[in-house]
Regions:
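H-loop (His-switch) and adjacent beta-strand-loop-beta switch element
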Residues: 211-224
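ABC-family P-loop ATPase nucleotide-binding domain
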Residues: 1-11, 221-230
Length: 230
């Protein structure tokens, strides 16, 4: 259940000018990989993440996700694929401020029409897995940044997606919380989840097993870390 991009482009019209955010990206990510995507502002890395996450469609090219062609899907098909296969974690957490951590995590199951008792049971189990069972009744403003990001990770996991996409997940965290969050991603990868991480921080990218660098809408390097023999 891997990912394959072939000659993906994404163009935007700005006035009379056409700007290519992606200029022909070809890439394969195997199931169970931990990949970091790096690049300066305007490099195309966020556009690439949006296409990988089925949040946007390319202007041209092919995107196979689990052997399904995604590039030509309509909005409903994209949404179904996204909800089934992908969990998202964002820099700003994107939590609902007026409901508890527990209810935030359970929210995707509301859309999936899972019964309330079952969704709260599943949300409690996942909060326990990320070390927040004692704070499940807390509101987001009663949690630290690291704790809020744990809630966001738990929410991303609630539908048991095969792929986790994280866009600058440590951008608003202190160094200690960043380490804790990256260790969670590492454990999820050990459990078989595919992790795709966008970051501009080299020290965060080093947690990944493969680092892809994007510039001017093109991949300029793709490096796999050597595994220790120990």
């Amino acid at each position: 259940m891997g990912i394959m991009l072939k000659q993906i482009t994404k163009c935007y019209k700005i006035g009379e000018e056409t700007v290519a955010a992606l200029a022909g990206i070809s890439l394969t990510i195997e199931t169970g990989e931990f990949v970091a995507i790096m690049g300066p502002s305007g490099s195309g890395k966020s556009t690439m993440m949006n296409i990988l996450g089925c949040l946007d469609r390319p202007s041209s090219g092919s995107y196979l996700l689990a052997d399904q062609e995604v590039a030509t899907m309509n909005d409903d098909e994209l949404a179904k694929t996204r909800n089934k296969r992908i969990g998202f974690v964002f820099q700003n957490f994107n939590l609902l401020s007026r409901v508890s951590a527990w209810e935030n995590v359970a929210l995707p199951l509301v859309y999936a029409r899972v019964a309330e008792k079952e969704r709260l049971k599943r949300a409690a189990a996942i909060l326990d897995a990320v070390g927040l069972s004692a704070r499940k009744q807390h509101m987001p403003n009663e949690l630290s940044g690291g704790q809020r990001q744990r809630v966001a990770i738990a929410r991303a996991l609630i539908n048991d997606p095969s792929i986790i996409m994280a866009d600058e997940p440590t951008g608003n965290l202190d160094s200690r919380s960043s380490v804790d969050i990256m260790r969670i991603f590492g454990k999820l990868n050990e459990q078989g989840k595919t992790i795709i991480l966008v970051t501009h921080e080299p020290d965060i990218a080093q947690y990944a097993k493969r680092v892809i660098t994007v510039r001017d809408g093109l991949i300029i390097s793709d490096e796999v870390k050597e595994q220790s023999a120990c």
